[in-house]
């Protein structure tokens, strides 16, 4: 009987230990499955508190905040977070980005229906990229696999419009002051352009670069427009842009002898 009691006590202790172990593993698994952004910015990152650095969505339910960390000689690293109106549901817009891409503050624009967000990211003197995010409930995540600006440049260099520049599209990485921007009017569906587009359907992008540093200067573009369709994911150049884009091509003056 003594041996039987010892076996039962031993089994009971083993079950308790196993239960504790399983509970611990379950908690660890749940923690690993939780979004990395749920906790919000780390202590190293400080909030930029200027009014221009915080943006509230048109429906007043989402706010964008910018945080920075001083990395010494390397510069500053920025994180861009969204929160709901109770400052909960923290979501990091740019996970994994280094100082090379997120070394400056950014500008942001919401679509009128608060379902889309564009980030205008300076990457150096005269250089800027665009990133597009889409809303799901109270959080935003990347809407495209590539930056929106890279997609716009792909469209330009593969279109007949680029042939006027007499440049090799393969050399695009060496261009100077490559700058993609938003044309004003995203917040009211570009009413000032005289177009009558569906609400929150299009984003109008301005593409720019110059010939600085080129020994034999070739034509370049300043403020060439294209439209991105948020519903279909396609780019186009509406007829209303024709006159404007015709003036976007710039030919450098001949080099003085």
Functional labels for PLM-detected ranges:
Residues 1-17:
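N-terminal secretory signal peptides that target proteins for export/translocation
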Residues 19-31:
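Bacterial N-terminal signal peptides
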Residues 31, 38-55, 69-70, 125, ...:
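Acidic, small-residue rich beta-repeat scaffolds with periodic aromatic anchors
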Residues 51-112:
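Short N-terminal edge-element motif at the start of the domain
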Residues 84, 131-134, 229:
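Structural recognition of the beta-propeller blade-terminating site
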Residues 104-142:
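Extracellular-facing segments of soluble proteins and assemblies that are Gly/Ser/Thr-biased and enriched
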